[in-house]
Amino acid sequence: MLFRSADGHDISSIASVASFFLSRIDSKVDDMLDQLAEADGGKRDQIVQVKGKVAIANAKIAYQEYKKITQSDRWQTLVAKGAKVQRLLWASTSTKNPAYSDVMYVDELIGPDTVNTLPPNTIEACADHCDVSSRIETEVDQAYAVIDTLPVVGINLDEVMDELLAEGIDKFIKPFDKLMDSLVTKVKQLSPA
């Protein structure tokens, strides 16, 4: 938006989200934590304390960073020119571990300027037992403590995120390529010979 605005273009119609795929984080980190707990019983208590909490902790910290950005002078300059706030989108919100609440990625992350994509089973669970109150800014200190524990037990979250990013891109590239191939085929079929 900075570049568009600097070039004199209207930025008031731009809408966007920054997506966070939540359950993938916990699935990957939890597997690593399980392996570490087996290998190093001395850190078992610390490992158990963070299991199933990394995705939400990371999202809550991201929200704090998001607020800093949207409250900055740089962003406020764009708002004065009509910019809409980019919202945080929570995706992959169905829990993969049956030991966890089926609405944990919803209940804990409700807040201003956020969007949550819900699969049908999570929608049904929310209709039944969600706590619809703004909690994105609760227990932020605990979120930092969860993330700070990871290197202590032997997990580099940056490396985990890089792996998840690569896996996620791959998961989107293959279907996109397949879609493009089918469109090319359809165009050829519909084109006069």
Language model segments and positions:
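Structural preference for beta-strand elements that scaffold enzyme active sites
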Residues: 13-19, 87-89
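Flexible, glycine/charged-enriched surface loops at secondary-structure junctions
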Residues: 7-12, 73-83, 157-162, 189-193
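A polyampholytic, Gly/Pro-enriched intrinsically disordered region
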Residues: 5-11, 37-44, 138
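Flexible, acidic glycine-rich loops studded with aromatic residues
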Residues: 82-188
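Active-site loops and adjacent core secondary-structure elements that bind or stabilize anionic groups
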Residues: 28-111, 130-131, 159
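Short, small-residue-biased leader/transition segments that mark boundaries at the very start
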Residues: 1-2
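Glycine-rich phosphate/ribose-binding loops and adjacent secondary-structure elements
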Residues: 20-25
